[in-house]
From Swiss-Prot:
Main location class: nucleus
EC number in record: 3.6.4.-
Any one Gene Ontology BP term: sno(s)RNA processing
Bias (Polar residues) ranges: 1-15
Keyword annotations of the record: ATP-binding, Helicase, Hydrolase, Nucleotide-binding, Nucleus, Phosphoprotein
Compartments, as annotated in UniProt: Nucleus
Positions with biased composition (Basic and acidic residues): 16-40
Protein name, UniProt field: Uncharacterized helicase C17H9.02
Source organism superkingdom: Eukaryota
Gene3D superfamilies: 1.10.3380.30, 1.20.1500.20, 2.40.30.300, P-loop containing nucleotide triphosphate hydrolases
Length: 1030
C-alpha cells in the first residue's frame, strides 16, 4: 500500500484484472504521483481458515464472555469440523444428522421414496441442503435447517405449507417480530392464498389453513388449550436462534415445551454450532425424530475488509474462500499503531476524521458500483447524523425520483393531512428522493416499511440502519459497512460477537445478482489476531437457553392439568444443556483429581506452615494499607504530583502520578452506607496497554498495564481510593496542561528519572511521615516485625529448590479449590435447576393471595393470567384495591403507560404534574408492598431495579392523546422519537385489551366498559395506521 499522503477524498481500485486478483479489493487513495510499482498488491500468503468453538480457544476476554463455556453445554464442533474442512463452502455440501428416540422405527433417509407428484415444484434446481430437508418434511419428521442468510431456507417452509394444504392440514408460521410476521404474511398470501395473520396489533382470517403469528400469540393459545392446536400438523419457527434472546427467548422455549407431541416442527436458523444438541432436546421432550440439515454454503461468496482509521485504503482480511490474510492483518495493526501514536484529537476532530473515513469509503463503493450498501450504525442518532452527512449526494435520476414520489405519496395517503406534515416525513422524503434511507426503531412504523419497500425496489442505494435490520427481513445488499466493530452493552463498549457480525455481514451479496458480497469494517483501535479471526472468520454464537421463571408462567401452568411448573423446569433446554454437560464436567473433575494426586511434596506440613505465614503477612499488609489510605490519614498527602501505585483486578500497575482528587457526591439517603475509601476519586497518570482503549477513550473495564516490550500509552485514569496500594514519599512537578499525548509523555518522563535515580521508589512511612495514631496500625506493624524475619529465614524463601516445592504446593491448593468448585457444580446440576426459585415464587403468590396453600390458582391468579404486557402482580393488586374504579379514560391510560414505557426514564417524580404524581406514587407504593413480600420470602430481588421499571415519562402525552391532542402535539410534549411513541402506544393498546379481559374474569363490568372506551379513544390516526404489507 502506498504511504504517500493526499487530501483527495476519493478511493479507487488498483489497476489490473479484478477477476484474477486474489486480493480483489485492494483500494488506494487516488494519488497521481504514486508510481505504478508502488501500487504493490497485498501479500498472497494465505493461512488455513479456522472454524472453531469459541469455548475451546483462548480468545479476547470480550469474546470469552459471549461464548459457551465447556462446563455449560456440549461442544458440537467435533460433529462439524471434519466434514466441513474441505467442502463446507461448496454448493454440493450439506451435512445431515438425525436424532432418533428409543423404540422408534426409523427408516434411513437414503431409502426415502419422494412424493409423486411433489407438494410443490420450483423453477430452479434445489440445493442439496434444500432437497435433504424436503425429504424430512415429506416423511412428516421434524427438521432444523441451519444455513446462512439468503441461502434459501424459506424453500423448506414453503414446501411444508404446500404439503399441509394438500393434505387438508393446518400449519402455523411463527416469527420473532411483528414486522417480519407482516412481511411473511404478504409473501405467503401471494403464494398460497389461504393465509391468516395473528399479532398483537391485527387479526386477519384466523380460520385460514396457514396462520402466521408471533410466538407470544402461539404461547397464549397453548395456555388456553385452543381448539386450533388439535388441527395443526406443522409449526414453523423462523429465526429460531432468537431463542437465545435474554428477554423474549423464554417464550420460544416455553412454547416448544407446551406444543403437543403429535405436531411436527421446522426450525429455520442461521448457522448454529450446537444444532445437534438442540435436536437432541426436541427429540427427548417430544419423543420424535429430529433431523439437522446444515450447510455453510453461501450462494454469494463474501469478502471481508477492514479500513483502519487513518489509512489510505482498505485491506482484505478474509477472502471468498474463507482464508484469513495474516500479512494484511499485520499491515492493519501497523496503521492503527501509527494512528494511535499521533497527537490526541479533540472530540470534534475525531468526529471529523470518522465522518471523513465514512465518506471516502462510501464514495469508493459508489464509484465502483458496489452499491446498494447497508451501513450498520449502533445507535439511532448515529444513523441520522451519518445520513444527513451526505446532504449533497444524489443517486436517483428523474425517473427514479418520480417512482419514489409515487410510492411515498401512495403509502402516506391513508394518513390525515396534519400527520402527513410531520417533520419525520419531510426529512425522509428529502433523503429517499436522493436514494438514501434510514432504518431504526425511532422511525414511524409506516416509514420503516416504506424504506424497506423502496430498498427492495432498488430505489434506495445507501441505507443507514441499526442492527435490527439484520433480523429476518430478506433485504440483501451488495456491500455492508460497519461504522465500528464495537457496540454499547449497557455499561461499556464490547466487541461484536462473531454471531452478531455474521448476522449483519450476511446481508452482503444478492443471490443471482452479485458474484461476490463485500463486508467492510471501520476499525479505530487495535484488535488482537485471534479476536479478529473470531470476528470475521469465526463460528456463529452458540444457542444457549435464556430460560427464566416468571409469575405469569407459573400462574398459567397452575391452570393446566397436564403439566406443572416443575415439569417445565425438567423439560427446559436450560436443564437439558446442564445435564448434557455432566459427562464433560465429571471428566474434568477426574483429570483434576489425578493431577492433584500426582503432585508429591516431601514435607507438605512445613510448606503449609510457610504458606500460612505468607497469608498472615498479606493480611497485616492489607490492614496497614487500609489504615494508610483512609481519607482522614492520606488526604493531606494526596497532592498533585505524588507518585502512587494502584491495584486493579488483582494487577499492580507501574508507578503513576496523582493529577487530582475529587470528592464524590452522594444521595443524602445513602451516604452512610458508602465506605470512606469509596468517597474519593483519584485521577492518576498511568502507563497502560493500548488494549485498554475503546473509541479513543480509556475503558475502565479492560484496563491493563503495558505488555512486556509494548510501548505504553500514558493516560489519565480515574480510580477509587480503594485502588491505591502504595504511596511514595516523592512528589514531582506536574504541568498544568495534560491534554495531549506529548504533555503526558513529558510528565511521565520525570517518573522514569526518579526510578533511575533511586532504583527503588521510597514509600511514605505511616508513622515517620504520616504520624498516624491507630491501634490497628500499631498492632499490624508489630506483628509484621515479628513475622517477617521468620519468612526471610525460611528455606522456602531463600532456597531455589524449596521455592520450587512451594510453587508445587500453590499449584496443588489451586487444584483443590477447582475440585471443590466443580464438585459443587455437579451436585447443583444433578438437581432440578431453578426449583428453589420456583418454590420461593410460589410462596410469594400464596402470601399475596394469588393461589391457595396447596398451590391451586385463586381468583387473583386467574385475573393475572389475562395480563402479559405489564407486571401482572402489581396490576392485579391495583385492580383489587379499586385503583381504576373512579378514573376517567385519560387517567386509566396514563396510569397504564407506566407499565409499557421501556425507554430510558428522563422524568423526575418531583416534576410530575397532578393528577399524574398522585397516581404514580400510588403505583410505587403498591410495588413496594410486593417488593417487601418478595424479600421476606427470600427471593433474590433488587428492589431498586424493580421499582425503576415503572416509568412516568409518557403519562402526560398519553392523557393528552386520549383527550384528542394531535400526534405533533404529543411529540413536542414527550420529546421522544416518533417510533418510540407509536411503539409504546401500541403496547398500551395491548395492555388495555388485557385489562378488559381481566375485568371480564373478575366480573367487573364497569372496569370492562372503561377499558373498552379508553381503547377506543386511544385507537386513532397515525399511531394505528395499517401496515403497508397488509
Amino acid at each position: 500500500m502506498s504511504e504517500n499522503s493526499t487530501d483527495s477524498k476519493n478511493f479507487q481500485f488498483s489497476e489490473g484484472s479484478r477477476e484474477s486478483s486474489n486480493d480483489e479489493l485492494k483500494v488506494l487513495l487516488r494519488d497521481t504521483e504514486t508510481k505504478e510499482d508502488e501500487k504493490s498488491s497485498f501479500s498472497n500468503s494465505e493461512e488455513e481458515s479456522i472454524i472453531e468453538n469459541l469455548s475451546d480457544s483462548s480468545v479476547n476476554k470480550e469474546y470469552a464472555k459471549n461464548s459457551l463455556k465447556l462446563s455449560d453445554a456440549v461442544s458440537e464442533s467435533k460433529y462439524l469440523n471434519p466434514l466441513l474442512k474441505d467442502k463446507r463452502h461448496d454448493r454440493s455440501f450439506a451435512l445431515h444428522k438425525v436424532v432418533v428416540p428409543d423404540d422408534y422405527d426409523y427408516i434411513p433417509l437414503n431409502k426415502h421414496i419422494p412424493s409423486d407428484p411433489p407438494a410443490k415444484t420450483y423453477p430452479f434446481e434445489l440445493d442439496p441442503f434444500q432437497s435433504t430437508a424436503i425429504k424430512c418434511v415429506e416423511r412428516m419428521e421434524s427438521v432444523l435447517v441451519s444455513a446462512h442468510t439468503s441461502a434459501g431456507k424459506t424453500v423448506i417452509a414453503e414446501y411444508a405449507i404446500a404439503q399441509a394444504l394438500k393434505n387438508r392440514q393446518r400449519v402455523i408460521y411463527t416469527s420473532p417480530i411483528k414486522s417480519l410476521s407482516n412481511q411473511k404474511y404478504r409473501e405467503l398470501l401471494s403464494e398460497f392464498g389461504d393465509v391468516g395473520l395473528m399479532t398483537g396489533d391485527v387479526s386477519i382470517n384466523p380460520s385460514a389453513s396457514c396462520l402466521i403469528m408471533t410466538t407470544e400469540i402461539l404461547r397464549a393459545m397453548l395456555y388456553k388449550n385452543s381448539e386450533i392446536m388439535h388441527e395443526i400438523a406443522w409449526v414453523i419457527f423462523d429465526e429460531v436462534h432468537y431463542m437465545r434472546d435474554k428477554d423474549r427467548g423464554v417464550v420460544w422455549e416455553e412454547t416448544l415445551i407446551l406444543l403437543p407431541d403429535a405436531i411436527r416442527f421446522i426450525f429455520l436458523s442461521a448457522t448454529l454450532p450446537n444444532a445437534l444438541q438442540f435436536a437432541r432436546w426436541i427429540s427427548e421432550i417430544h419423543k420424535q425424530p429430529c433431523h439437522v440439515v446444515y450447510t455453510d454454503y453461501r450462494p454469494t461468496p463474501l469478502q471481508h475488509f477492514i479500513y483502519p482509521q487513518g489509512a489510505d485504503g482498505i485491506y482484505m482480511l478474509v477472502d471468498e474462500k474463507n482464508k484469513f490474510k495474516t500479512e494484511n492483518f499485520k499491515k492493519v495493526l501497523e496503521v492503527l499503531d501509527h494512528s494511535t501514536r499521533q497527537e490526541n484529537y479533540s472530540k470534534s476532530s475525531k468526529k471529523v476524521k470518522k465522518s471523513s473515513s465514512l465518506e471516502r469509503i462510501i464514495n469508493m463503493v459508489l464509484s465502483n458500483r458496489y452499491d446498494p450498501i447497508i451501513v450498520f450504525c449502533f445507535s439511532k442518532k448515529e444513523c441520522e447524523i451519518n445520513a444527513h452527512q451526505f446532504g449533497k449526494l444524489d443517486l436517483n435520476d428523474t425517473e427514479n425520483k418520480e417512482l419514489v414520489t409515487e410510492i411515498f405519496d401512495s403509502a402516506i395517503n391513508q394518513l390525515s393531512e396534519e400527520d402527513r406534515g410531520l417533520r419525520q416525513f419531510e426529512e425522509m422524503r428529502s433523503l429517499l428522493l436522493r436514494g438514501i434511507g434510514i432504518h431504526h426503531s425511532g422511525l414511524l412504523p409506516i416509514l420503516k416499511e416504506l424504506v424497506e419497500i423502496l430498498f427492495q425496489e432498488g430505489l434506495v442505494r445507501i441505507l443507514f440502519a441499526t442492527e435490527t435490520f439484520s433480523i429476518g427481513l430478506n433485504m440483501p445488499a451488495r456491500t455492508v459497512l460497519f461504522t465500528k466493530a464495537q457496540k454499547f452493552s449497557g455499561n461499556n463498549f464490547r466487541w461484536l460477537t462473531s454471531g452478531e457480525y455474521m448476522q449483519m455481514s450476511g446481508r452482503a451479496g444478492r443471490r443471482g445478482i452479485d458474484t461476490k458480497g463485500l463486508s467492510i469494517v471501520i476499525l479505530d483501535q487495535s484488535i488482537d489476531e485471534q479476536a479478529a479471526r473470531c470476528l470475521m472468520n469465526g463460528q456463529a454464537d452458540v444457542l444457549n437457553s435464556a430460560f427464566h421463571l416468571s409469575y405469569g408462567m407459573i400462574l398459567n401452568l397452575m391452570r393446566i392439568e397436564e403439566i406443572s411448573p416443575e415439569d417445565i423446569l425438567k423439560k427446559s433446554f436450560y436443564q437439558f444443556q446442564n445435564m448434557e454437560s455432566l459427562p464433560l464436567i465429571k471428566e474434568e473433575l477426574m483429570q483434576l483429581k489425578n493431577e492433584e494426586t500426582s503432585i508429591n511434596i516431601p514435607n507438605e506440613t512445613a510448606v503449609k506452615e510457610f504458606h500460612d505465614l505468607k497469608l498472615q503477612l498479606e493480611k497485616y499488609g492489607e490492614e496497614i494499607q487500609k489504615v494508610m489510605t483512609h481519607p482522614d490519614n492520606c488526604l493531606p498527602y494526596l497532592q498533585s504530583g505524588r507518585l502512587i501505585q494502584i491495584k486493579l483486578g488483582g494487577i499492580i500497575f507501574p508507578w503513576g502520578v496523582l493529577v487530582n482528587v475529587i470528592k464524590r457526591e452522594f444521595d443524602p439517603n445513602t451516604r452512610e452506607q458508602v465506605a470512606p475509601h469509596e468517597t474519593y476519586v483519584l485521577d492518576v497518570l498511568l502507563p497502560i496497554s493500548s488494549n485498554s482503549m475503546s473509541n479513543h477513550k480509556v475503558n475502565p473495564s479492560i484496563l491493563v498495564p503495558p505488555r512486556p516490550n509494548e510501548t505504553p500509552l500514558y493516560e489519565i485514569v480515574s480510580v477509587l481510593l480503594t485502588a491505591v496500594c502504595n504511596i511514595s514519599s516523592i512528589r514531582i512537578y506536574m504541568p498544568r496542561e495534560l491534554n495531549s499525548n506529548e504533555s503526558k509523555l513529558r510528565a511521565y518522563r520525570r517518573v522514569n528519572e526518579v526510578i533511575e535515580e533511586f532504583k527503588e521508589i521510597p514509600y511514605l512511612d505511616p508513622l515517620e511521615h504520616m504520624h498516624i495514631e491507630s491501634s490497628t496500625l500499631s498492632l499490624s506493624l508489630r506483628k509484621l516485625e515479628i513475622l517477617e524475619p521468620k519468612l526471610f529465614d525460611s528455606p522456602y524463601y531463600k532456597d531455589s529448590k524449596h521455592r520450587a516445592e512451594y510453587h508445587e504446593f500453590r499449584k496443588k491448593l489451586n487444584l483443590r479449590a477447582q475440585i471443590k468448585d466443580i464438585s459443587t457444580k455437579i451436585t447443583n446440576t444433578e438437581a432440578i435447576i431453578q426449583l428453589r426459585e420456583l418454590k420461593i415464587r410460589q410462596r410469594v403468590l400464596r402470601r399475596l393471595g394469588f393461589c391457595t396453600l396447596e398451590n391451586v390458582i385463586d381468583i387473583k391468579g386467574r385475573v393475572a393470567c389475562e395480563i402479559t404486557s405489564g407486571d401482572e402482580l402489581l396490576l392485579v393488586e391495583l385492580i383489587f384495591q379499586g385503583f381504576f374504579n373512579q378514573m376517567p379514560p385519560e387517567e386509566i391510560a396514563a396510569a397504564l403507560s407506566c407499565f409499557v414505557y421501556e425507554d430510558k426514564s428522563e422524568v423526575s417524580t418531583l416534576n410530575l404534574k397532578e393528577p399524574f404524581k398522585k397516581m404514580y406514587l400510588t403505583i410505587i407504593e403498591a410495588a413496594k408492598r410486593i417488593a417487601t413480600v418478595s424479600l421476606e420470602s427470600k427471593l433474590q430481588f433488587n428492589e431498586s431495579d424493580y421499582l425503576h421499571q415503572f416509568k412516568p415519562d409518557i403519562m402526560e402525552p398519553v392523557s393528552l392523546w386520549i383527550n384528542g391532542a394531535s400526534f405533533q402535539e404529543i411529540c413536542i410534549v414527550s420529546k421522544l422519537y416518533e417510533g418510540s411513541i407509536v411503539r409504546t402506544f401500541r403496547r398500551l393498546d395491548e395492555l388495555l385489551k388485557q385489562l378488559e379481559h381481566a375485568a371480564i374474569v373478575l366480573g367487573n363490568n364497569e372496569l370492562k366498559e372503561k377499558s373498552v372506551l379508553t381503547e377506543q379513544k386511544l385507537h386513532r390516526d397515525i399511531i394505528f395506521s395499517a401496515s403497508l404489507y397488509l
